[in-house]
């Protein structure tokens, strides 16, 4: 056994036998066999010392390259309906229950189409229409249908949606509209969810996701790291996602919003955030892992490069729903510098 494979572990048994090093285990289990780490193994990765971060990121990158390939999928998002949401997601400035500065507003169809055009020009293959709602009503679904039709008439791009929790009938309607992928985040570990949301349950979200998959749409499901969860709960969340097995996992990092219950939380340290990126890649070797909201404030420009070389293989370009993102040009230049090709539209269809 190599030196790397026999590093001391806090989990050594009472007989004094040293446990195998978790990254050596991951190299065999994940890199060679494509089997994701389980919850306990992910926790061991999250507990690694800072001096092993680069080793972790290098392994996560190797896993991503072997099981996902070099291509990076680029996506843009737009808010069709902003603010006024009746739910109490403690991280979200769009809740109508908090004293945040975001106010309710709707986007018109011509503006939606123009946003899709600009997104496609950036090289993106996915354009996600988002609404701040518990779930869509008839008016919203009608607006979404009109928007999708208008986009398809003028723009060559996949259309995704994120419209909250759905009924079985609404799932079928969206599938019939040609929605390529549906985003609905579990947000955090099942055991921590009630600390984040109280107006609906984790199980309700899970039910929507299973119906989406059954209807033939791709499933996009991730969450936000740095909302006060423990490392154990972060590992649990990775295991929850592995059980769901979505097509895409967007990783957000809390960007505390004024007026929300989480507005005074500390931003996740960059090293801890990158360690989570590597750990989630080792838990989900074949899944599209997307850099999403909060990466700018958490990681900065250097962190974007380290994440893409540490397991990430998809990005959201431009701005987010209520916060500013990196300019699309900055991300595209970075990908070009790293010689990472953009995923082509025909490979996404």
Swiss-Prot record:
Binding site for [4Fe-4S] cluster: 85, 89, 92
Keyword field: 2Fe-2S, 4Fe-4S, Biotin biosynthesis, Iron, Iron-sulfur, Metal-binding, S-adenosyl-L-methionine, Transferase
Binding positions for [2Fe-2S] cluster per the UniProt entry: 128, 161, 220, 290
Cofactor binding remark: Binds 1 [4Fe-4S] cluster. The cluster is coordinated with 3 cysteines and an exchangeable S-adenosyl-L-methionine.
InterPro entries from the UniProt entry: Aldolase_TIM (IPR013785), BATS_dom (IPR010722), Biotin_synth/BioAB (IPR002684), Biotin_synthase (IPR024177), Elp3/MiaA/NifB-like_rSAM (IPR006638), rSAM (IPR007197)
Functional pathway: Cofactor biosynthesis; biotin biosynthesis; biotin from 7,8-diaminononanoate: step 2/2
Cofactor: [4Fe-4S] cluster; [2Fe-2S] cluster
Catalytic activities: (4R,5S)-dethiobiotin + (sulfur carrier)-SH + 2 reduced [2Fe-2S]-[ferredoxin] + 2 S-adenosyl-L-methionine = (sulfur carrier)-H + biotin + 2 5'-deoxyadenosine + 2 L-methionine + 2 oxidized [2Fe-2S]-[ferredoxin]
MF GO annotations: 2 iron, 2 sulfur cluster binding; 4 iron, 4 sulfur cluster binding; biotin synthase activity; iron ion binding
Radical SAM core domain mapped to chain residues: 70-295
GO biological process terms held by the UniProt record: biotin biosynthetic process
Family membership: Belongs to the radical SAM superfamily. Biotin synthase family.
PANTHER family in alphabetical order: BIOTIN SYNTHASE, BIOTIN SYNTHASE, MITOCHONDRIAL
NCBIfam families recorded: bioB
Oligomer and partners: Homodimer.
Function of the protein: Catalyzes the conversion of dethiobiotin (DTB) to biotin by the insertion of a sulfur atom into dethiobiotin via a radical-based mechanism.
Descriptive protein name: Biotin synthase
Organism in which the protein naturally occurs: Mycobacterium marinum (strain ATCC BAA-535 / M)
Taxonomic lineage of the native organism: Bacteria, Bacillati, Actinomycetota, Actinomycetes, Mycobacteriales
Gene: bioB
């Amino acid at each position: 056994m190599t030196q790397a494979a026999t590093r001391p572990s806090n989990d050594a048994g009472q007989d004094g036998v040293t446990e195998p090093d978790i990254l050596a285990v991951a190299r065999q289990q994940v890199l060679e066999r494509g089997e994701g780490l389980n919850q306990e193994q992910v926790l061991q990765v999250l507990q690694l010392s800072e001096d092993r971060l680069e080793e972790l990121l290098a392994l996560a990158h190797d896993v991503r390259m072997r099981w996902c390939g070099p291509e990076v999928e680029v996506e843009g998002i737009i808010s069709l309906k902003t603010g006024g949401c009746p739910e109490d997601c403690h991280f979200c400035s769009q809740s109508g229950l908090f004293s945040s500065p975001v106010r309710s507003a709707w986007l018109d169809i011509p503006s939606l189409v123009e946003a899709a055009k600009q997104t496609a020009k950036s090289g993106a293959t996915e354009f996600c229409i988002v609404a701040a709602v518990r779930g869509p009503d008839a008016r919203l679904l009608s607006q979404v249908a009109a928007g999708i039709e208008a986009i398809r008439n003028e723009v060559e791009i996949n259309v995704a949606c994120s419209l909250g929790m759905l009924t079985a009938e609404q799932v079928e309607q969206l599938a019939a509209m040609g929605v390529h992928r549906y985003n609905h985040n579990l947000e955090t570990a099942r055991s921590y969810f009630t600390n984040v949301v109280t107006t609906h349950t984790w199980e309700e979200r899970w039910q929507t996701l299973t119906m989406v998959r059954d209807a033939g749409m791709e499933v996009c499901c991730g969450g936000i790291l740095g909302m006060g969860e423990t490392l154990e709960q972060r590992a649990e969340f990775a295991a929850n996602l592995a059980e769901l097995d979505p097509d895409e996992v967007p990783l957000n990092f809390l960007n505390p919003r004024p007026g929300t219950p989480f507005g005074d939380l500390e931003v996740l340290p960059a090293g801890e955030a990158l360690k989570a990126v590597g750990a989630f890649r080792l838990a989900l070797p074949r899944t599209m892992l997307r850099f999403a909201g909060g990466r700018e404030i958490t990681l900065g420009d250097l962190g974007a490069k380290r994440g893409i070389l540490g397991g990430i293989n998809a990005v959201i370009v431009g701005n987010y729903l209520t916060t500013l993102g990196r300019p699309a040009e900055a991300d595209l230049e970075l990908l070009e510098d790293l010689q990472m090709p953009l995923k082509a539209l025909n490979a996404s269809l």
